[in-house]
Structure formats: structure tokens, C-alpha cells
Amino acid sequence: GLMSHFAVHVSPVYYLMLPFFALAPYPATLQVLQAAVLASAVIPAWKIARHHGLSGAARMLVCALLLLLPSYSGGTSYDLHENCFLTPLLLWMLYGLDTANIPIACISALLTLTVKEDAAVYVAVAALFSVVRSLLRGAGAEKKRLLLSAGLLAAAFAWFFGVTAFLSSDGEGVMTYRYKNFYFNDSSSLLTLVQAVFMNPMKAVYESMEPEKLGMLGLTMGALLGLPLITRRYE
């Protein structure tokens, strides 16, 4: 039978599309809205590039490459998925963290959390990166960014455990079956997953290095010419 999306995912971000869909209640409206959301990522991408001193031509190239990346824009032709919000919102959050802009970082992080329950992982990783960077730099000017990042990290954990508990009690439960090769003692808890990684880290390394996953990593990095690995700051 039919099942509500909200029985398996917590995605209130979809309500941002509701006013437009109410005006034009057609499937094509959702496709156009998804394309607009994806395209909006060029705004924070442009601002991040400008913040780091890239020229106007370089900024245009960055934005063009983002829009032309097949894995990014290809889904607009046939599908609708809440993950379309992730890239623009995460770029806004990274911009907010980069510039220590509290309103931008907090609002974009909050909206990212409303995309899906596991979107908290993206917020947590970005916040953790910012915490480590601030600690390594150690300058007094980093205190504001450090506190902001620590707050977002705590919020991401609180949200994740809150919404997963909600899905377990009032929904169909969290879709944890994809991690079943990490579970033990007949447990399907995400806490068991974390425990398994700490108890046997080589299992996590092995799972990450399977041939098909290495191929996927090669395709991903190849399309980006390895640019994510070219940096002067490896924190």
C-alpha cells in the first residue's frame, strides 16, 4: 500500500516548496523547483570563491563547473528528491563558518537538518572540520568561529538522536538495513554501528576499500580533476 515519506524520513524542508506547488499543482512544478534549488548553489559558491580571493573569471568557472557536473544536474530530468537542498544549504553553511557569520551559519545549518535525519552527519562533519581548523590556528580571532562550530556540532548530534528516536517510536523506523554488515548481538541500533567502528576500525577501512567503491571514488575525483585533494591546509 501507500506509505508516507514522513514515515521513514524527517524532511520538513519540503514545505518550502508547498506555496509554489499550491499555486501550480503539477508534477512539472516540482521539477522546476528542484532545478531552481540546485541552481541556487552558485550564489554561495560565488561568495566562497570571492572570499578566498578568486578572480571574477575563476568564480564564473567554478559556478559553471558546478552546474555542468552531470551527477549534480542530471537528476532534474526525471526525479524529485529532498537531497536537492543539500548542496546549496551546505555551501551557505560553509560560507557562514568560513566568515564566522553566525546568522548565515546557523540558519543554513538548521535548514540542512530539516532535509533528512541523516543530514545531521553533514552538519556535524563540517562543524568538526571548523573546530579542528580553529584549534590548529589557535589565534584569538578564531574563538568566535570555534564557539559557533562547537554549537553546530552539538545541535547536529541532538537533532540526529531526536529525530531517529521519533522515527522509531512514531514512524516506520530508521532505514538502518544498509549498515547491517556492521551490526552484532542482534542489534540494529546506530549506536551499535559506532561501537563496531571503534572496536574494529579495520572493518570500516575494508568496507571503504572494496573495488566498486574505489571505482566510484575514482569517477568522483576524476570528474573534479582531483581538485578536492589539492590544498595547502589538510586539516
Positions of predicted regions on the chain:
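Extracytoplasmic catalytic-loop and juxtamembrane helix elements of membrane-embedded
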Residues: G1, S149, F157, V163-K203
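Loop-to-helix entry region of an early transmembrane alpha helix in multi-pass inner-membrane enzymes
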Residues: S4, S11, Y15-L18, L23-I43, ...
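Transmembrane-helix signature of polytopic, membrane-embedded enzymes
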Residues: A28, A36-L68, T87-P88, I102-I107
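Multi-pass, polyprenyl lipid-linked donor-dependent membrane glycosyltransferases
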Residues: L33-A39, L61-L97, L111-V123
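Membrane-interface transmembrane helices that cradle and orient dolichyl/undecaprenyl
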Residues: H52-G53, F85, L91-I104, V131-G138
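Short hydrophobic alpha-helices at membrane interfaces in multi-pass membrane enzymes
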Residues: A57, W92, G96-T114, K143-G151
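Perimembrane helix-loop-helix junctions
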Residues: Y122-F157
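Hydrophobic, aromatic-rich transmembrane alpha-helices
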Residues: E210, L214-E235
